[in-house]
Regions:
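Non-catalytic substrate/cofactor recognition surfaces at enzyme active-site rims
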Residues: 1-262
Length: 262
């Protein structure tokens, strides 16, 4: 399977939780109850029966969401196959271009550096917990370790950004007849995908995100100017290694290669 640009998408909407739950209860009926009963959380994680029941309900809801998504994918595939099978081609002109492009990093400002430095100093005064509630200790220690790591990452990026202002990315572009596929390493915001598709000479252009670069650095978000200005989880300095200018460079380089192999 491949994933198109989806860095600014999530398969849920937070403003109609009650309606969503009612829909799944009507759709899946007794399955929802079975899913709740199947998930037996350890008592050490959730000491009270009420907590365990609440978490089991969350598990059932998440499972229903995934069932629903899977069913919609199957339905969409079956519908498309009805008419797509009318144009099955056994011979195609295939080309594969690979190159490494350089993209502008998102710079850390002096103010952001000072803020993260001070935050790191404060976090170092906080102790990791042991000997208490196992689940609560795990959550606390995981959050603390993550926050310390994030601060250190920002400080390191600030220290090397002048010497290394750009980051390499392996770009693959494939021609298959009248359609094309173009990869990127990011959780890419949809705007960039649309910019590429609108200028591509191909009849249809597929964007494949999270490709060619393994590891945590390969999957960082590539947010737009508007997203960074309005802030948010996927547009924070912790989650963006590349700037919006770098995102546009990705667009330009991808379009250039698409035109070359067309």
């Amino acid at each position: 399977p491949q994933s198109a640009a989806a860095g600014d998408l999530a398969p849920r909407q937070l403003h109609f939780k009650a309606a969503e739950l009612r829909r799944y209860q009507l759709k899946y009926g007794k399955l929802m109850t079975q899913w709740e009963e199947q998930m037996a959380f350890p008592e050490a994680w959730f000491p009270t029966p009420e907590n365990r029941k609440a978490q089991s309900a969350v598990f059932a809801l998440e499972r229903a969401r995934r069932y629903d998504i899977a069913e919609r994918i199957v339905s969409a595939f079956d519908e498309v196959l009805i008419w797509a099978r009318r144009d099955i081609r056994l011979e195609l002109d295939i080309k594969h271009a690979v190159t490494v492009i350089q993209l502008d990093k998102r710079r850390i400002t002096p103010e952001e550096y000072v803020r993260e430095r001070d935050e790191l100093a404060t976090l170092k005064l906080e102790s990791f917990r042991t000997g208490g509630d196992a689940y609560a200790d795990m959550i606390h220690n995981s959050v603390l370790a993550s926050r310390i790591s994030r601060c250190r990452m920002i400080l390191n990026r600030y220290e090397i950004q002048d010497a290394e202002p750009r980051m390499p990315m392996e770009l693959h572009v494939i021609k298959m007849g009248s359609i094309a596929f173009a990869s990127n390493r990011f959780e890419l915001f949809m705007d960039y995908m649309h910019r590429i598709q609108a200028r591509s000479p191909f009849e249809q252009t597929f964007i494949v995100q999270l490709a060619a670069t393994p590891g945590m650095d390969g999957g960082t978000y590539l947010a737009t100017e508007r997203a960074i200005a309005n802030k948010g989880y996927s547009a924070s300095l912790y989650d963006n290694l590349i700037s919006p200018a770098g995102g546009q460079q990705l667009v330009e380089e991808t379009v250039r290669i698409l035109k070359e192999i067309f």
